[in-house]
């Protein structure tokens, strides 16, 4: 019987398979940041252990960093302690660190792919739930907890049960203006925020393979938001072209040999999935979340749903609670509500193509007077590229704030956050209660939709812009 892409990568990494036990997988890459690593390094220190494979471990600072200054004190004492501790730990254990002053610093899931650290067929872990991003390369990538971070640091392995498999196929081509973010939000709207629980998802279909690597990263980034353990997309020529020539990618004949192997990383024709979900790309419109989980999402031209429209009593109760928290009225349009803040950034949408998409909307226009709009590139490399293209000038002339790289307003762990009841159009991945600040109201959208909301002062359908 044939194997799925996930099964091929999983099986290739089984180091120990004792009877009656979950297999132990070898881990090819371990990405580390300042928030989930301090206790893991403490554990090594207490037990007198070293980092097993320093050459496969890469650290950066992203969650706590200020986006207005490189001053390590700017985000408060706890942030300073976490960043200083990461510096100390990386120096002591010999781990490569891209700190806040390094030219490669950035959000861990932006930094890894752009440097060629992320490669097809690998197992990749990080103490961060959105590690699934790297699955866009056909790698098995997933988030782990701090005790598991310690285990990988010490052994370069991890005990990991085999997951069920789900195929999500997006058939046909999307309409003009529809982005990867719209595709993945539409998928989560279809599956719900728990529909992928217990599964590793493979995304496929023409609408997926048409995406650039950056678009594919956006899709896989949000696999966790439908409850999945990880999300993968089979590598192809788009993947190989992206990887070629990057800092840590194979070079010359090694690259050619790697590509030959990478070409085998696809689901066999006769392979069986445990579940299959199908969407028609032509049906996907610009998406906006209305509730407090990413599955509570509608097309921008749809009315806000009424709780009684949900047959499931749990979903109905969830909708009632979400509408109350979000300050929304069923039946109205989301465009009836002003936004207070706009955030273009996060590991979902802070790469150069995201910057370009937002700049295209911003060019020659002005941010509404009541809106604060932040553009936060995902890394120093993205920032430099955007500035070389003059995108920062476009944003600043339009009234957007051009910031330094970091996780920023995706989560309220630094100075970029919402005040109580402030409404935000955000390109991030989570719209949970309080995610962007206490009592903050988050609506997830694409970079183009976010930029358009900043200018109009409320949500608009980008298909209707001049």
Swiss-Prot record:
Q: What is its EC number?
A: 4.2.1.33
- Known InterPro entries for this protein? 3-IsopropMal_deHydase_lsu, Acnase/IPM_dHydase_lsu_aba_1/3, Acoase/IPM_deHydtase_lsu_aba, Aconitase_4Fe-4S_BS, Aconitase_4Fe-4S_dom, IPM_dehydratase_rel_enz, IPMI_cat
Q: What PROSITE patterns does the record tag this protein with?
A: ACONITASE_1, ACONITASE_2
Q: Which reaction does it catalyse?
A: (2R,3S)-3-isopropylmalate = (2S)-2-isopropylmalate
Cystines in this chain: none
Protein family membership: Belongs to the aconitase/IPM isomerase family. LeuC type 1 subfamily.
Can you state the subunit structure given in the record?
Answer: Heterodimer of LeuC and LeuD.
The record describes the protein's role as:
Catalyzes the isomerization between 2-isopropylmalate and 3-isopropylmalate, via the formation of 2-isopropylmaleate.
Query: What is this protein identified as?
Result: 3-isopropylmalate dehydratase large subunit
């Amino acid at each position: 019987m044939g194997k799925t892409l996930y099964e091929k990568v999983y099986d290739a990494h089984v180091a120990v398979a004792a009877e009656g036990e979950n297999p132990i997988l070898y881990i090819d890459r371990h990405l580390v940041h300042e928030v989930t690593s301090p206790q893991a390094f403490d554990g090594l220190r207490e037990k007198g252990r070293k980092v097993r494979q320093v050459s496969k471990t890469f650290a950066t600072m992203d969650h706590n960093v200020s986006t207005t200054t490189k001053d390590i004190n700017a985000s408060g004492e706890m942030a300073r302690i976490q960043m200083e501790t990461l510096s100390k730990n990386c120096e002591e254990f010999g781990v490569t660190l891209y700190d806040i002053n390094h030219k490669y610093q950035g959000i861990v899931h932006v930094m890894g792919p752009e440097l060629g650290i992320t490669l097809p067929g690998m197992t990749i872990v990080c103490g961060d739930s959105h590690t699934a991003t790297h699955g866009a390369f056909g790698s098995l990538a997933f988030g782990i907890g701090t005790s598991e971070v310690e285990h990988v640091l010490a052994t370069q392995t991890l005990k990991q049960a085999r997951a069920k498999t789900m195929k999500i196929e997006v058939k046909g081509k999307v309409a003009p203006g529809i982005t990867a973010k719209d595709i993945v939000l539409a998928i989560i709207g279809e599956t719900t925020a728990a529909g992928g629980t217990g599964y590793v998802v493979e995304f496929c279909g023409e609408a997926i393979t048409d995406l650039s690597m950056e678009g594919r990263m956006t899709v896989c980034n949000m696999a966790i938001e439908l409850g999945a353990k990880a999300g993968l997309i089979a590598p192809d020529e788009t993947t190989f072209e992206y990887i070629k020539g990057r800092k840590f990618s194979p070079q010359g004949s090694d690259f050619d040999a790697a590509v030959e192997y990478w070409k085998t990383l696809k689901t066999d024709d006769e392979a069986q999935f445990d579940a299959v979900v199908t969407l028609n790309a032509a049906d996907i419109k610009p998406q906006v979340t209305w509730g407090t989980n990413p599955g509570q999402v509608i097309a921008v031209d749809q009315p806000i749903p009424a709780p009684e429209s949900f047959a499931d009593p749990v979903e109905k109760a969830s909708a009632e609670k979400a509408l109350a928290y979000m300050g929304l009225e069923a039946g109205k349009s989301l465009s009836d509500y002003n936004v207070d803040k706009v955030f273009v950034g996060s590991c979902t949408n802070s790469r150069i193509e995201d910057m370009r998409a937002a700049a295209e909307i911003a060019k020659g226009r002005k941010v509404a007077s009541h809106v604060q709009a932040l553009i936060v590139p995902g890394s120093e490399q993205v920032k430099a590229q955007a500035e070389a293209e003059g995108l920062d000038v476009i944003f600043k002339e339009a009234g957007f704030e051009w910031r330094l790289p970091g996780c920023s307003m995706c989560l309220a762990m630094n100075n970029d956050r919402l005040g109580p009841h402030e409404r935000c159009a955000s390109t991030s991945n989570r719209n949970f209660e309080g995610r962007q600040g206490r009592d903050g109201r988050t609506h997830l959208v694409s970079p183009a939709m976010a930029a358009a909301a900043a200018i109009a002062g409320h949500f608009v359908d980008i298909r209707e812009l001049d």
